[in-house]
């Protein structure tokens, strides 16, 4: 007997931030197993969002959901079709080649055996492409982490806004030390913890749900001598003051998730709290910053 086809809904959206927002809504609405949600960036900067269903969805209801979360213009791109039954996540990721970043290589399970043995392998098999290494912000953070590790071995690391957990996993693999990771989004907390276990650093990476630095875990675990935060420009600016309070003297901070034209404002916010910029990487229109706390 032939397996039943998979029902697919897909639409396009104009930015990573907008894609994150709508994917957050979709993953909250659908129970795990009811629908699988994926988002991938195209070469032109647009993001394709797809949902796969075992049973045909209510198209009118789903269109209304997309209108409410992304607007009429985005909903106009919504299309429905059926595809042959297969491991569609694996198929989607087959076009994503391993991404080298210094000593690190981020890859999917389909490329597990293609990575050189002298590299620190980070396997990310998430339903979402945020933080798989194929975005310039993730690669920039990994390159700056590699740079930091050439001259120091941080002993207390925080990955703020961990997403898939890729940065926390990288730090844990390189340092063989405990790393605290946090995210505001419950599905991201779950995915990051799962990825930590997949990469055999689950005993080093502790993932918590938190908004900014509000959770008491940060005060208990700090001060940190390395913080990684790959989020967005506005949250980064607002977090400058609380982050500075949780840093050890001389701590390094790696920031990304900001467009290149947004970097000066972010740098200014952190300079006002006693952090000086050391390096600035620009990849595909995105900036990644390395700063140091003076004192």
Swiss-Prot record:
Disulphide linkage map: none
NCBIfam families reported for this sequence: PRK00517.2-1
EC number, as in UniProt: 2.1.1.-
UniProt binding sites for S-adenosyl-L-methionine: 138, 161, 183, 230
Enzymatic reactions: L-lysyl-[protein] + 3 S-adenosyl-L-methionine = N(6),N(6),N(6)-trimethyl-L-lysyl-[protein] + 3 S-adenosyl-L-homocysteine + 3 H(+)
Function: Methylates ribosomal protein L11.
Phylogenetic lineage: Bacteria, Pseudomonadati, Pseudomonadota, Alphaproteobacteria, Hyphomicrobiales
Originating species: Bradyrhizobium diazoefficiens (strain JCM 10833 / BCRC 13528 / IAM 13628 / NBRC 14792 / USDA 110)
Record gene name: prmA
Compartments in which it is found: Cytoplasm
GO cellular component: cytoplasm
Keyword S-adenosyl-L-methionine appears in the UniProt entry: yes
Keyword terms: Cytoplasm, Methyltransferase, S-adenosyl-L-methionine, Transferase
Assigned protein family: Belongs to the methyltransferase superfamily. PrmA family.
Gene Ontology terms for molecular function: protein methyltransferase activity; protein-lysine N-methyltransferase activity
Pfam families reported for this sequence: PrmA (PF06325)
Top enzyme class: transferase
Protein name: Ribosomal protein L11 methyltransferase
Single GO BP term: methylation
